[in-house]
């Protein structure tokens, strides 16, 4: 992956913000609680290895990803074998020995998984597993006492397996109404009584639960969205126990500036017509970069002023109405701060009627990531080259 890029569009990742958010969570939950840094989906679009290393430096003790490939990628990129990595999604039984050899723990939730995984035993290294219990999310997890006890029996009978953890996932921890959260929490407590083995790790808290209920998270918290400085929901913004620092910003530069007359039209479909003489700037970012067509009419920052996107967003470019003539090369901020004004990830999410999680995840590999510490560039990643 190249350290240079040749296009006037880039994302900036503030690693100091990541560090602060992890340290703040550690202080919030207490020293007896491990912080598991969730770096799936390329660390929510921020950069997996850079965020992982920063989170570990800040005090996280483990990493979590969505599937085995992501875990193996972290190992290849330099995360040492002494750092445990948990795969949160399903993994085929035949890959269990590979995971074990790389100190990658797998999520298990079916007894028949063990029946198939045993075929590949004995393993050179035992496999750590985390048993997932479905307390009401309805996604992955065992639901009955029989299922749980069958898995426990399989683990007890085969030295290739170690029950390292048991966990569940809350569906509504980020909502003000706590009824369903309380139901899931009580269900988890009840299901834990089915275990004849006490695993070292018991975890139920995502970012929302960790922030709101530090007394109900057992001994580990899976720190995802708020590690990146984003509130788990709009409802939770007023409930945050400490301020979060947003790590992701997105920028570009004007590549063309022109004056159009009233009545002239802009972009595909000729959906925008200038009412009077206007200055129009072209910005080299489009929906192939994850800046969706639905961003039409959204305003970005240029020279500290709000400039609306006019006409349809193209695959690689878009046009904005400038407040006045500006030179080619002027910086355009799509997410982030400029001259005291700020556009947040939440602002973008609200415009396209989605959640903040989706925005940095959507910004594609075509957009280089610049990593900052102490406001200085320490690394550039360009996945195109």
Curated annotation (Swiss-Prot):
Active-site residues (renumbered): 40, 268
One Pfam family here: Ala_racemase_N
UniProt KW Transcription regulation keyword: no
Modification N6-(pyridoxal phosphate)lysine occurs at: 40
Residues annotated as signal peptide: none
Reaction(s) catalysed by this chain's protein: L-alanine = D-alanine
GO terms, biological process: D-alanine biosynthetic process; peptidoglycan biosynthetic process
Name of the top EC class for this enzyme: isomerase
EC number: 5.1.1.1
Swiss-Prot/TrEMBL cofactor(s): pyridoxal 5'-phosphate
Binding site residues for substrate: 139, 315
GO annotation, cellular component aspect: cytosol
Keywords: Isomerase, Pyridoxal phosphate
Membership in a protein family: Belongs to the alanine racemase family.
Protein's job: Catalyzes the interconversion of L-alanine and D-alanine. May also act on other amino acids.
The protein, known as: Alanine racemase
